[in-house]
Amino acid sequence: LIKPNHHELGEIFGVTLSEWSDVIPYAKKLQERGAKNVLVSMGGKGAVLIAENGQIIAGESSKGVVKNTVGAGDSMVAGFMAGWMQKRDYEHAFRMGLASGGASACSENLATRQEIETEYEKTAVHYL
């Protein structure tokens, strides 16, 4: 798993990326270079997962009040990995990542398990 944000992904390839549709071809280029799963966070626009099995899933966490974004990306990675270990299902792992990152961004510190579970229930994803 590699998890750049859309700015970092753009820097790698010398382009500006602002929409999910912009991100996908460059995330696939990372896969061509050896990454299996590419999870790109896009701030308030959510995130997109380009999975090794070919699935492309996009989504957003609920629109809570952002209090502290420090650690939100790390929380997203941790949530994704925990979700993957639970069910070996990309949609579940992606939703867990979105929920963990979103809940942490809306907390003063890292989110609690209850906050993440509540956010998970509000998190919708769709396939591209």
Q: What is the predicted role of each segment?
A:
Residues 1-25, 46:
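Conserved beta-alpha-beta core of the PfkB/ribokinase-like small-molecule kinase fold
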Residues 20-128:
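Conserved phosphate-binding/catalytic region of the ribokinase-like
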